[in-house]
Amino acid sequence: EGEVLFQSERAELYREYFEKLRESARVYPCFCSRAALHAAEAPHLSDGSVVYSGTCRYLSAEEVAEREKRRSPAWRIQVPAEESAEIRYSDGLLGECLQNLARECGDFVLRRADGVFAYQLAVVVDDALSGVTEIVRGEDLRSSAARQVWLYRMLGFETPVFYHIPLLTDAD
């Protein structure tokens, strides 16, 4: 019910919330390509993704300026240190869930190098501003829930209740 929203038309709104996160000094430019990350980083998770090690996290202003001459950066948000990176949330079907952002995903992208805002930021902003209180989705998206819960909290939004349902994999 209501207006249909297109993420492709909401870049200015996402930029506003991206800037709020940048003001927290947790957002930084990252010049690592996906190919370089997959080739150099370990461990790879079971879904093929990589835990980002923070390669670009502490670049100096001079290093950033030099690298910007060669390529546009993506922008990542620094997750809490290992000891405070545990995100707990309630899943209406699975009960209490726990994920350590530092260990299981690392700093993650908020805005890609081409300027497009990442799904993690866009979905949190859209759902929060639309008044979404319950999210029902497949088990395959459970690994992104903790990142989203953390972004809800960082932006001062109420966290919805998640329901991750099993996927149908065959006719039986």
Label each PLM-derived region with a short phrase.
Residues 1-36, 76, 162-164:
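Conserved alpha/beta enzyme-core scaffolds, especially Rossmann-like or related mixed alpha/beta domains
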Residues 34-172:
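Active-site cores that bind ATP or allylic diphosphates and position pyrophosphate for catalysis
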